[in-house]
Amino acid sequence: MPNSQTSNSQPQVSEKDVDTGFRKGDDTFTHWRNVFNILTGRMTDEGIEQFRVARDLRNEAADCKRCEDQRDYLLQWSPIIRYMSDSIRQLGGDLSSHNIYCRRCTNRKAGGFDPEYGILICANEMKDQGHLEDTMAHEMVHAYDHLRFKVDWTNNLRHAACTEIRASSLSGECRWAREFFRRGQWKLTQQHQECVRRRAVLSVMARPGCQDKGHAEKVVNEVWDSCFRDTRPFDEIFR
């Protein structure tokens, strides 16, 4: 009789069979079960992302409505947003509710600027009205720079680094209180500069022409002095 052969191969486990700790469902019990799994470390990074995506889809309409209401309020009453709007208008541009869009984003960012379309605000990433104000101001600095300096967004990393330095410095997102309470940065000295530099490097790293972190840091360093000192359209760093 022929010898029987025993297979040593293990059954393949598909991605669908992997337990990430995330449980589907919109009911209150399932929601808190997922929260408990996150708090106790029973949910993987993939599961946490699944939880966030499900939450964002469930809250999309409410998130966008809240974002639009706060956007309109800031356009009317926020000193920095009104000042940036006026400065952009003086250069022949126009940013208002018709081209500042509140949308659900699938990548984890606060917003973006496109010269053709305007400003995108990621409604599902906005923590509060202050966060929205910082994000709008940041993207408005990009819009101002595009109109005044003719930024080459595609091919010139120095241009990208300079406008990121200015946007992070002038928008208010790097002021001490924001860093301390929201991002857990505890330094008291040189905090503003370190925040601006860190965010500029991360932004340049995301550009197609950037090779690595070292390349991004080199580009940021090359333009740092002139771009950090340039506070236009403000006389000095606004906040």
Swiss-Prot record:
EC number: 3.4.24.-
Annotated segments matching region Disordered: 1-22
InterPro entries: Peptidase_M76_ATP23
Pfam families: Peptidase_M76
Subcellular location: Mitochondrion inner membrane
Keywords: Hydrolase, Membrane, Metal-binding, Metalloprotease, Mitochondrion, Mitochondrion inner membrane, Protease
Any one of the GO BP annotations: mitochondrial proton-transporting ATP synthase complex assembly
A GO MF term: metal ion binding
Protein name: Mitochondrial inner membrane protease atp23
